[in-house]
């Protein structure tokens, strides 16, 4: 108890210090990405730190833990989304005009570089790196700090895309205020990322049409054996002040379902290794019943790819039908009690659709493996 009390006092001191740094304009905690240097806000609020840099932080408590005792991956995703929502909403309201709130449209691939422990302080730093006419790109770094030793480490990197929705009509997308780039190449690189994610979002929306159906008495190691679903009634605590679900709430539920699928498949401790792009196809309003479904799509020797689909049912509005709200692929690894990675049982696809999804997952796995190896090669 004494250590916890001391940790809480230190955490409060750290929050106060972070606030002073933010006001003083000393920028973000953690390393920046070299290809995406911070840009400058244009408008009445240009006195903020570069790009309106947003820093949030809090101590990780026992209710943030997964069954293994580390911080739940969904909790980290939720903190990432909150930081992104703050900075993008702030920027989109930086000029005079119709007020808006930034809604999450997409999360690019997110890597879990290192586990975060209960009792550590999570520092989440966000900055805007590109804007188009109707969207904002935000890059987020997550650092963990051991407040007893002072040691810090980078645990997560993520890129998120937001769109500004009018407060008067949340179905209306507003224009994004411009930013000033430090160099022309930075804007060109951002435009390429924007066009790439836009194309992939369109392809994903058409591809993810089928619904996960339960199967009686499935065989072990098959897709049906581990597929899982959660049903959740969207309440006020899940929503923004404007009545639709926080993207972070949806991501945490998706991570929980993916974790259940992975645990059922390998019967060991599991941990989130990465999240492929999460696409938010439509808003989820308060009062909807959402079904979050997960199924195994591919296994390598030591990793599992799980597809997660979110369907929303507006039960209080008979004029609306059930619709696909979000979709993503999660990658999990199996761990021993000592925290070492273990081989996973190989998935046995049965139907033609399952075999097709397996080959598609294999392609994504090999593509990402080649990309990692390319980054690991020494520079000449």
UniProtKB/Swiss-Prot annotation:
Pathway named in the protein's UniProt entry: Lipid metabolism; fatty acid metabolism
Compositional bias annotation for Basic and acidic residues: 353-363
Residues at the catalytic site: 66, 255
A GO biological process held by the record: long-chain fatty-acyl-CoA catabolic process
Keyword entries, A-Z: Acetylation, Cytoplasm, Fatty acid metabolism, Hydrolase, Lipid metabolism, Mitochondrion, Repeat, Serine esterase
Residues covered by region (Disordered): 350-380
Protein name: Cytosolic acyl coenzyme A thioester hydrolase
Organism expressing this protein natively: Homo sapiens (Human)
Taxonomy of the source species: Eukaryota, Metazoa, Chordata, Craniata, Vertebrata
